[in-house]
Every structure is written in C-alpha cells, then in structure tokens.
Regions:
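Unchanged
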Residues: 28-51, 62-110
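Nudix hydrolase/Nudix homology domain
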Residues: 18-21, 89-133
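Residues in well-ordered beta-strands of folded domains
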Residues: 1, 24, 56, 75, ...
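Gly/Ser/Thr-rich beta-alpha loop segments that engage phosphate groups in nucleotides
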Residues: 22, 27-28
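N-terminal strand-loop-strand
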Residues: 1-22, 50, 54
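Short, solvent-exposed loop/turn elements at beta->coil junctions and helix N-caps
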Residues: 56-62
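Structural signal for conserved beta-strand scaffold positions within catalytic alpha/beta enzyme cores
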Residues: 10, 57, 93-95
Length: 133
C-alpha cells in the first residue's frame, strides 16, 4: 500500500481472474528477497520507486488444488517518480473512505484490516476459515 497526503494508490486490475480495485503487487522471483520483490513490482506496476517499505502483515490462502500461498503486505510512503498506469490496470489515488465504496477485487475487503489496524497482522483464508489475527 502506497500512501501520500491521506490518499492511497490503488489499481483497478484488468485480470479476468481477479478483477477490481486492489493494491499494486505481484510475485517473488527466484532468489529475490521479499524487499526487492515489492520494490520491483511497485516499479513495474506504478513507475514509482519506493523507499523503506514496511512489512505490516501476511495473508495465507489455498487454491482449488490445495496449494498454499503466502502474501506479504507492505506499506510505503516514501517514493520517487511519477505514477503511470501499466498493462496490469489503471492507477488511481483514493482516500480510505473512497476505497471502501468502490468495487474491490474478490475478498480484498477482508485484507484491508491488516493494512489499517496495527493490532491485526494476519489474514487466513481457506475452504473452512476466513479469519484475522
């Protein structure tokens, strides 16, 4: 999550599997640190170079074949460059309130407490549970 002056940078994803508003991000490449991954993905999707990203929580979920995935949630408020949308989708600056009124990507609303509540650091999602810790 990238923040500036009370606004949050969100991406309206074009992905047919997971369309809707979410935060920029992506996958970790082989032999890449999580830190380097978030810096690279943000650059690829927004054209911004973030500085001092802070890990704020994690999400774990399972796909339809019961493969486990772990997502690392970061926040950053220091960056350089100009915002530029990518093939991933259109970028928009929104307030927290505006974000909550938009069409979000599937289950993304369940991730948001990890970003906004410092007492919550984990989101577990599987066939039987959708819990925050």
């Amino acid at each position: 999550m990238i923040e500036q002056d009370g606004r949050i940078l969100a991406i309206d994803r074009k992905d047919p599997v997971w369309p809707g508003l979410t935060f920029p991000g992506g996958h970790v490449e082989d032999h890449e640190s999580f830190h380097d991954s978030v810096v690279r993905e943000i650059k690829e999707e927004t054209n911004l170079t973030i500085k001092n990203p802070r890990l704020v929580g994690v999400k774990q979920f399972y796909d339809h074949e019961d493969h486990r995935y772990i997502v690392f949630f970061y926040k950053a408020s220091e960056f350089s460059g100009e915002v530029k949308s990518s093939e991933e989708g259109k970028l928009i600056w929104v307030t927290k309130e505006e974000l909550m009124q938009r069409k979000l990507a599937y289950n993304f609303d369940h991730d948001l407490p990890v970003f906004f509540d410092e007492n919550i650091s984990e989101h577990l999602l599987d066939a039987a549970r959708d819990e925050l810790f």
